């Protein structure tokens, strides 16, 4: 994955960007074969919900059985890091510039939105996946569901 051109991003702001990207990305089944985001977002949400209880259970189980605490702590830390890994990946992905094939498709979707009378802000610099997510979300809200068939 390439890094953004002239954008300096704080490590912790990547998590916020990842959360925003996960909320913005349209979870449409028709996008799943083309983009990996549907699976990553679903798994990240699952990890946010279930990994903290798994970590607590692992620690409590080892303490209750009088087992070694070291491996239990390592397992708990790994379980707690899984949601963070997903959010970090989503944050990095949101800043990644679009490849040429998707870039053409992005401009076609924007063109369809403008033809439908939607006012769109001009694209600054090279569009990234966050801009694609914003455009797709708006397209699924404003346009007919068949707009993907024409592209």
From Swiss-Prot:
The chain crosses the membrane at residues 46-65, 69-91. Residues 66-68 are periplasmic. Pfam families: DUF412 (PF04217). It is found in: Cell inner membrane. Keywords: Cell inner membrane, Cell membrane, Membrane, Transmembrane, Transmembrane helix. Residues 1-45, 92-151 are cytoplasmic. InterPro entries: UPF0208 (IPR007334). GO terms for cellular component: plasma membrane. It is a multi-pass membrane protein. The keyword Secreted does not apply. Signal peptide: none annotated. Belongs to the UPF0208 family. This is UPF0208 membrane protein YfbV. It comes from Salmonella typhi. The lineage of its organism: Bacteria, Pseudomonadati, Pseudomonadota, Gammaproteobacteria, Enterobacterales.
């Amino acid at each position: 994955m390439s890094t953004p051109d002239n954008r300096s991003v704080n490590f912790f702001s990547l998590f916020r960007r990842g959360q925003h990207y996960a909320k913005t990305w349209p979870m449409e089944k028709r996008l799943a074969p083309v983009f990996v985001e549907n699976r990553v977002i679903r798994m990240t949400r699952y990890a946010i919900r279930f990994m903290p209880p798994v970590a607590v259970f692992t620690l409590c189980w080892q303490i209750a059985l009088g087992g070694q605490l070291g491996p239990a702590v390592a397992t708990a830390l790994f379980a707690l890091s899984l949601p963070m890994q997903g959010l970090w990946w989503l944050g990095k992905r949101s800043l990644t510039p679009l490849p040429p094939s998707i870039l053409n498709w992005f401009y076609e979707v924007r063109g369809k939105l403008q033809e439908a009378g939607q006012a769109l802000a001009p694209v600054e610099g090279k569009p990234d996946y966050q801009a694609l997510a914003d455009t797709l979300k708006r397209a699924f809200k404003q346009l007919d569901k068949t707009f993907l068939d024409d592209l």
